[in-house]
Structure formats: C-alpha cells, structure tokens
Amino acid sequence: LDDANIDYVGVMAFPSRKIVGDVTEEYTIKVINAVRDYADRFAIIGGVEVNELSIDEVKYWLNKQYESGISAIKIHPVHHWVKPNAYRPEEQNLKQLELVYQFAEDHRLPVYIHTGTSMAPKARNKYGDPIFIDDVSVDFPKLTIIMAHMGRPIWMSTAFQLVRIRPNIYADLSSIPPKKMLEYVPRLAEISDKAIYGSDYPGPGVYDIKANLQEFLKIPIPNDSIKKIVDDNPRKILKPLSRNR
C-alpha cells in the first residue's frame, strides 16, 4: 500500500455459500481480527446471506459484525440469487433483506450492491440488473447505496442514469479496466461527485493495485474530477476500521 501511495483499502469479506462453499458470516469476523493490528489501513465490508438465514440469525450477525467494526455491508444478488428489492411485497417479501437495509440506514453504514454479470459458474446473472436498486433508493432515502461495478458490462446506461437521478446512489468503478473507462462511462466527469474508484483486486484481469491506480489516474478528465473519485469520495463514504466502533 505504501508503494502505491494508498492510505487504506476496502476489503470485501462477505458470505458466499452458493459460489464458494463454506464461507459464512463468521468469515467477516475472521478477516477483521486478522487485520486488527493495521486498523488504519483497512475498511472491511461484511454482509449476511439473507436467503440462507432466519430473521433472528440476520439480526445476530449484523450486530456481531457491526460491533466488530465493519465499515459497510455487501449484498451480492448474482451470487446470493436474490433481487436487491426482494423485500418488496410484490417481489419475494423477504423480511431478512428489509432488515439489512434498515439496520444499515439506522447505523449509517453504506451498502454495496453488486451489479452486472459474474463469470462464476453458479452465478445467476439475471439478478445483476441495477434497476432493482431503484426501489431500495426510494424506500430507504437515508441509506447510502453504492452500485458495485456500475452494471458492467451490459447495464451501464441504467446504472449511470440511476446515479444521476437518485441522490443516495453512488457508482463504484471497480472491475472496469481504466484504459476502457471512458468507453464504458463516457460522461464519467458528470458523476464525479458520486463515483468511487476501486480496483476489484485480485479479481479477473487485475494483477496489481498500484498499476491499476496509475492507469486510472491517466484517464483524460479534469484533475478535480479524478481527485474526487480516488480520494475525496472514498474517504467520505468508507471509513477505515480504526474509525469504527
């Protein structure tokens, strides 16, 4: 991190039974404990697999992860096989998911929601459409929502419009190759107040955090827009472990 001139990074540490196997809510706690001595360098994003747990279990794990110091919550519809708006009565009426959003709103935790496709063999990509997040934005207006990957590669226009019209929806740019960023998001500068840099390391095609960041810094948009995306906005939204409970 020092070599890349990065103060701290966000680490996704959420359960994934269907895709990875025996990776449960306890995994979040293990990751937090592993980096506790470097709490100023890491922000841990936890989560619960809402369609695998009872309401009481969801409450238990949310509280335990919060007390341990999570900086945000991650929902992965494509890997968890659930719509982001599945709590709605006309959808699945999944109270466990509603509880997650309410908890995050009450505790001022941002929520990352995966959008776009996944190459995982058991992924259900139909759940990656960002339009389902629109309901969440309306129903939880005080919740900070971060659309991970901005719907890439097939729903990016939908994601862009949601960032523009919904004040509590932000765009996470991770996993979009910096060299192709303006092909995917040609009007990136217009949403620089609501966009957040990310690498998705060690995800597909991302082999080095420093190299990825350096490529991003070369994107031909105004310098103040770059600074907002790589520095100002992440610091505002995602706090390191040392700043939490």
Name each region found by the language model.
Residues 30-33, 60-64, 99, 132-135, ...:
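Alpha-helical elements of Rossmann-like donor-binding domains used by nucleotide-donor carbohydrate transfer enzymes
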Residues 10-12, 45-47, 74, 145-148, ...:
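Active-site neighborhood of phospho(di)ester-bond hydrolases with catalytic His/Asp-centered motifs
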Residues 7-8, 16-119:
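Active-site gating/metal-coordination segments in enzymes
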Residues 87-196, 244:
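Catalytic pocket-lining loop regions of alpha/beta-barrel enzymes
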